[in-house]
Amino acid sequence: MSDAAAGAGPLAGIRVIDVGTRISAPFCAGLLGELGADVIKVELPGEGDFMRTMGPFVPVEGEGGAGYSLSWAVEGRGRRGVTCDLRQPEGKELFKRLVATADVVCENFRPGTMERWGLGPDDLPSDLVFVRISVFGQSGPYAPRPGLDRLGIAFGGLLNLTGEPDRPPVRPGVTVSDYLTGVFAAFAAVSALYGRDVGRGPGGGAANGDPDGEPGGEVIDAPLYASILRILEWTLAGYDTLGIVRQREGNRLAHSAPLDNYPTGDGSYICIVAGSDANFARLCAAMERPELTEDPRFVNLAARGAHGGDINGIV
């Protein structure tokens, strides 16, 4: 953070306009800022980013109201801020003047919103890297639908895999699709900047062997659900090749044991993962049960997976 604050880092000299709200687009812009980019946050006058209203809150001495949002403290840091109503003619003009000085714009409005305001990619400089985050992407039958993180993890398939086998699906503990998509979008933005400025991307211009070419920007379409699809391990391949419809497994895995969160004597839990034969042998020694390594049910990973209930119960 000290390098970024001082304008150092690999993205020093790059300017990012964060016109998003809630988590995904601001998080993407924040990651670029941590790499040294100059990030400018654009917020609606009076209302500001919705994250300012998300708790928990820290009381501010001498001020009324709920206090200072910790959500905003985490995701709104590391950037300068301006207010600008993009729905008004004056606001549109101010935004265009600001974007003319920038390299990247990050937004996560419902698809079509920026175009309706006259601020879509075709209305802005052609060398801009335009990051667009939404639940379902910028095209397709679901594109116009609004939504937040929960729909991303549901439509992407993660929600159905989270929880106990005999219970309803459970939301992960954090907003996974928002944060994950922010990471993928930041990676794509850096790649697009490299392609634009070094000339090995679709719009490489002069550096790509065209002496009269102009550097080209990119429009990055980053759907929440697609980020979730990318981390589903073997789920899609298993269905495509073997017809397996993966189900919830709780804390355990069908092919690996021992693996669980085990209760402790002080009323807490300890996470133990000992899938490999070497790790299992060390665990048995720590439990003072070395004979378990010779038990036919536990002699190797496949055997332990087939008898996961037995070995997890012993542990």
Regions found by a protein language model. Name each.
Residues D166-V174, D197-G203, G209-I228, Q247-A254, ...:
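Conserved Rossmann-fold dehydrogenase catalytic segment
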Residues H255-V315:
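Aromatic-enriched alpha-helical interface/lid elements that frame and gate functional surfaces
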Residues G182-G201, G217-E218, R230, W234-L242, ...:
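Oxidoreductase and adenylate-handling cofactor-binding alpha/beta cores
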Residues R52-V60, G238-Q247:
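Short, surface-exposed loop/helix-turn segments at secondary-structure junctions
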Residues E63-G64, W72, E249-A254, D260-N261:
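Short Gly/Pro-enriched turn/cap motifs at secondary-structure boundaries
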Residues D18, D85, E107, A222-Y225, ...:
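Active-site-adjacent beta-strand anchor residues
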Residues G46, V135-G137, L224-L229, D266, ...:
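Glycine-rich beta-alpha junction loops
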Residues M1-G213:
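N-terminal helix-loop segment corresponding to the beta1-alpha1 unit
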